[in-house]
Amino acid sequence: MTGSQVIDAEEDRHKLVVEYKDALQPADFYHNFKQRSIRSVQLIPHLEFDDRGDLTAASVTAELWGKFLIALFECWVRADISRISIELFDATLQKWCGSENPQLRRDCQACDWHRLCPHAREETPDSVLCAGYQAFYSYSAPHMRVMRDLIKQHRSPMELMTMLR
């Protein structure tokens, strides 16, 4: 894992900055933090802007961010549900189970995925990654539905891992 790492000692959550080069190798990135016994992760996309306000070449693009999240999700959903906490995946499942987003930004109201997106509330640099988040939400939706339904039946979402084998 080449990205920066900051440890939040209060919550024991590792904040991992996902650099462009990390996003190109999502399976390696995932297996690296898994091998290091990291069990709680917040992913932070590396975003750097030039003087014109455009993303620099060192930044993660929306397309690459979406592919990265999907590949990471594939690793997680097949082997580590409830074993490794990835904040975005956990928050997405919570939204599928009924928690609501507060006040939405105007440009997010028409998005099919606004109820899931953590960035729909305020203007953030992450909003340049909307297409990547949308790709992830679209891809993960069938899996999230199954996990939601398992939870509603008072069963473990981990059962999905067996179903996917």
Model-derived features with residue positions:
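Flexible mid-to-C-terminal extensions adjoining Fe-S/redox cofactors in radical SAM and related proteins
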Residues: 100-165
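Radical SAM enzyme [4Fe-4S]-AdoMet core and its adjacent flexible, acidic
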Residues: 1-99
